[in-house]
């Protein structure tokens, strides 16, 4: 199963774990997802974050909904940063899930509760 290959951890001690930060004003939700907030992640052709996905699973929902995906295509000068900002609207509570993919260390996830 794919779920058995996804790694997680504390983003303060593991540079691959995506960090999820959000602000909510009314029904507008702004979410920033970044990799390497505390410990910078390399961004070279040999070792880089290829993409980040953000998912939202409403409390009453049967399955998560893909909010968006960002691909990072350049790993030379000028360097891209593994960081993305997403906007969506909801009045529901639920879970925000972020996935990131490192070309050497695979899939990483994190989650936060959207109040």
UniProtKB/Swiss-Prot annotation:
It catalyses: reduced [rubredoxin] + superoxide + 2 H(+) = oxidized [rubredoxin] + H2O2. Pfam families: Desulfoferrodox. Keywords: Electron transport, Iron, Metal-binding, Oxidoreductase, Transport. The keyword Electron transport applies. Its EC number is 1.15.1.2. SUPFAM superfamilies: Superoxide reductase-like (SSF49367). GO terms for molecular function: iron ion binding; superoxide reductase activity. Its cofactor is Fe cation. Fe cation binds at residues 14, 16, 41, 47, 102, 105. InterPro entries: Desulfoferrodoxin_Fe-bd_dom, Desulfoferrodoxin_Fe-bd_dom_sf, Desulfoferrodoxin_SOR. Gene3D superfamilies: SOR catalytic domain (2.60.40.730). The keyword Ribonucleoprotein does not apply. Homotetramer. Uses electrons from reduced NADP, by way of rubredoxin and an oxidoreductase, to catalyze the reduction of superoxide to hydrogen peroxide. Belongs to the desulfoferrodoxin family. This is Superoxide reductase. It comes from Thermococcus kodakarensis (strain ATCC BAA-918 / JCM 12380 / KOD1). The lineage of its organism: Archaea, Methanobacteriati, Methanobacteriota, Thermococci, Thermococcales. The gene is sorA.
């Amino acid at each position: 199963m794919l779920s058995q290959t996804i790694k997680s951890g504390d983003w303060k001690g593991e540079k691959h774990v995506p960090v999820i930060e959000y602000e909510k004003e009314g029904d507008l939700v702004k979410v920033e997802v970044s990799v390497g907030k505390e410990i910078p992640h390399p961004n070279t052709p040999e070792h880089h974050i290829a993409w980040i996905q953000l998912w939202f699973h409403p409390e009453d929902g049967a399955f998560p909904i893909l909010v968006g995906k960002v691909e990072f295509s350049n790993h030379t000068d000028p360097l891209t940063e593994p960081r993305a900002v997403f906007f969506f609207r909801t009045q529901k509570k639920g879970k925000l899930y972020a996935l990131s993919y490192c070309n050497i260390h695979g899939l990483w996830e994190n989650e936060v509760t959207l109040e």
